[in-house]
Design a protein with these regions (language model features):
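Binding-interface segments
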Residues: 4-5, 10, 14-161
């Protein structure tokens, strides 16, 4: 009786064999085995990823490791387009990378709804004022914004609708 190894099991084994490479790529604050465990969970949730181009899949895992992000759908995602897999950092992951850079003091992103009080000014002294409606229907989302303050007290604003 011969046992056949499925492509999913084979790829999970490949991830385990790459533990040293992941350890080298990951920030020192991250454990390579936890990274591999999350990567394997990603494959279990979306087994079609192992049918895609293996090089693009492995590049996705390695890029996530280099950025110090887990492919958990919150920090980053492995998304299949045709036969290739793309590494997509998510908002939570981007914020994590910025915090870990040591260059950002605070950062936030918020959704503004049509019944919130919202005002912003551009120019040499940009300013955002957002007072969410506490009681009642906030309405539909109308825009989002992000604010970042750097460790040298620089302030950056971005409003997107």
């Amino acid at each position: 009786m011969t046992s056949s190894i499925t492509p999913l099991v084979a790829m999970q084994g490949t991830l385990e064999k790459m533990a040293d490479k992941f350890k080298e790529a990951l920030p020192s604050t991250m454990d390579e085995w936890k990274f591999i465990s999350v990567a394997k969970l990603t494959l279990n949730k979306n087994p079609k990823l192992v049918q895609a181009d293996k090089n693009s899949l492995m590049q996705t895992f390695m890029r996530a490791a280099q950025d110090g992000l887990y492919l958990d759908g919150k920090e980053a995602a492995a998304v299949q387009y045709g036969n290739s897999v793309q590494y997509i950092p998510m908002v939570e992951g981007i914020i994590k990378v910025l915090h870990n850079s040591g260059l950002i003091k605070t950062i936030c992103a918020e959704v503004v709804y049509e019944n919130d009080l919202f005002d912003y000014e551009l120019g040499t002294a940009p300013k955002i004022t957002h007072k969410p409606l506490i009681i009642g229907d906030r309405g539909k989302p109308i825009c989002v914004y992000a604010v970042a303050v750097t460790t040298n007290e620089g302030e950056y604003y971005e409003v997107m609708n």
